[in-house]
Amino acid sequence: MPVDGGAMVPVNHTGYFDFVYGGIPAFLNGRRLVRFMAKKEIFDNKIAGPLMRKMKHIEVDRFAGRGAYEEAVRRLRAGALVGIFPEATISRSFEIKELKTGTARLADDAGVPMVPVIMFGSQRVWTKGHKKQLGRVNVPVWIRVGEPIATTGDAAADTKTLHDAMAEQLHQLRLDYIDRYGDAPGAYWMPASLGGSAPTLEEANVMDEKLRLERIAKRDAKLIAEGKEPLGDTKLNDAAARGGDGDGGFGDGGGNGRAKGANGSDGTTGDSGAGDSTAGSPER
C-alpha cells in the first residue's frame, strides 16, 4: 500500500465489515485512511449517515453518479486513497464476480494506480443470509495487498486485468488460509470450488439478478403509488452513462474505521508474508 500519493483501492466484497478490514493495510502502513465510495442509502440512515459524513466517505447516488465520480477524481488527484467495491455487491459465492469499470475509469482519469486489497474470512464474521459472529470469536480474517496496477486508457481491458489479478490473489490467499487452518468441507463460508456449501458463482449471479429485479419492481411500485414516473431498468442504465456504472457501479461499501482485533488491540496482528495481515473479528 503506498505511503503517499493517491490510489484507487478496489476491495473484494464478501461481508458487511469489509469496509473496515479493507482500510487496515493503509492504516498500518503510514496511518493513512481510505475514503470509501458508498451508496446513498447508507448516508440516508439516521445513525450511519452522520458517521459516514464525519469520516469523509463519498456518497454515491446510483441514479446520478456524476457528482460522486467527480468528487472521487478530485480527492485522488489531491493524494487521497479512495476505496471501492468493484463487484458492487457482496459475492455470495465468495469468488470474484464480474467487476464494474468504474474503478479503472476513476484511476485513469485521476492518473493514479489501482492497488487491490484481497481478503478472506470476512464472510465468517457477517455476510448475506447467515448469522453474525460478533464479539471475541477469534475468526481469522486474512488481508493481502496486491501490486499496483497502472491503467492504459482502455477501461474494459484494465478492468479485466484487475479482475484477473484479484482472482489469482484470492485463489492463493485461500490456499494459504486452508494450509494454516485446514479444510472446512461443507462450510457455508467456503467456496464451492474448495468443497464448501456456498453457491457457485453462476448460482449466485442468478440469485442476485432475481433480487435486483424485485428491488426495481418494488421501487417502481412505490413511485407509481406516489404519482411519479417509474424508473425501470432503462433510466438506471441512462444514469450509468451519465456518470458511473449505475446500479452499484461504484460499489455498496460502508465507512472505513479502525477495527479492533480479537486480542482487543487496535488494528490487526501481522501474519506471515509481506503484505499480509490477520484481523480478528471486531468487538461490539
Describe these PLM feature segments.
Residues 66-284:
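Non-catalytic C-terminal accessory region of glycerolipid acyltransferases
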Residues 3-64:
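Catalytic core of membrane glycerolipid acyltransferases/transacylases, capturing the structured
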Residues 1-2, 74:
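Short amphipathic alpha-helix with an adjacent loop that forms part of the alpha/beta core around
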